[in-house]
């Protein structure tokens, strides 16, 4: 799955699949994070998830971004 061909009808399962897409995460961590945040808020606005679920998804997105930054720094030898 790439950022360019995302479905407009996301589900929680779609969101979780994109979260676990390590290739997209490491190639474009900022765009990946932004997409996760936007889609989590969209799921909330569409009343697919509740506020507590939104908080959980946002925390997972932030953790994925932190992981990507740490991994990329380690790979570049800057840690």
Regions found by a protein language model. Name each.
Residues 1-79:
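Acidic, Ser/Pro/Thr-rich low-complexity regulatory regions
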């Amino acid at each position: 799955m790439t950022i360019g061909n995302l479905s407009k009808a996301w589900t929680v399962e779609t969101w979780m699949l994109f979260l676990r897409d390590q290739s997209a995460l490491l190639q474009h961590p900022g765009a990946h994070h932004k997409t996760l945040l936007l889609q989590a808020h969209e799921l909330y606005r569409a009343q697919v998830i509740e506020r507590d679920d939104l908080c959980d998804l946002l925390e997972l997105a932030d953790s994925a971004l932190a992981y990507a930054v740490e991994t990329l720094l380690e790979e570049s030898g800057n840690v």
